[in-house]
Amino acid sequence: TAALSLGSIIPGFGSNSYQEILGANEKIRIGVIGVNSRGNALAQGFAKMKGCEVTYLCDVDSRALERCQADIHKISGRTPKGEKDIRKMLESDDFEAVVIATPDHWHAKAAIMAMQAGKHVYLEKPTSHNPAENEMLVRATLKYNRIVQVGNQRRSWPNVIKAIEEIKSGAIGKVRYAKSWYVNNRPSIGTGKVVPVPDYLDWDLWQGPAPRVPNFKDNYIH
């Protein structure tokens, strides 16, 4: 849930970094990129957090954008600015940090673009599609001196941290082998059928850095 991941966001910033982000502002101003489902939940979580203000939203789906603007207004009494084009959004000085919850193929590209624009980043997992993109991401953090916090919230759960501490202390002896797995009975999105691109969607921006496909299917947006 958003509440679980939010616990890992602000603690990821050291006190000096936190003050750097704040600057002369009393609140960290946040822009959220990708606000359908997960991004909307994160935007609402930040809007409810003391010391944060969601000032800008970006999504290529106008329905998701308008829905999230309304949700944030209910929480804060203010309506964030909205934009479909990440490039135009990142030209704004209305926020210091961004939350990225786009489809996966946009993650690394959006994070690097945000750092180039001087923004700190909370990036949803996965960080990239391949090791090369991850290496580019790391180089960008060093080049632009920006903070990137990845949404691996389970690493910040107290019970997980405690277990790691006990293992390192030798509580179960020398660990020679470990096995983990994840199970989630999510329904299939199906194969979809070819339909016209809906008028509420900027399909070119949705594809972004990904290779272009000839047709749009009705299960691409879900």
Annotated model-derived regions:
Residues 1-123, 132-147:
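N-terminal glycine-/serine-/threonine-rich beta1-alpha1-beta2 phosphate-ribose binding loop
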Residues 21, 91-92, 169-171, 215:
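Surface-exposed acidic, glycine-flexible loop patches that form ligand/cofactor-binding
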Residues 35, 199-222:
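Glycine-rich, aromatic-lined ligand/substrate-binding cores of catalytic
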Residues 38, 62-63, 88, 156, ...:
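Surface-exposed, flexible loop/turn segments at secondary-structure boundaries
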Residues 49, 99, 155, 213-215:
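Redox-cofactor-proximal catalytic regions of oxidoreductases
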Residues 59-61, 102, 179-182, 210:
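Residues that line or immediately flank small-molecule/substrate-binding pockets and catalytic motifs
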Residues 120-122, 127-208:
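A contiguous active-site-proximal alpha/beta segment in oxidoreductase catalytic domains
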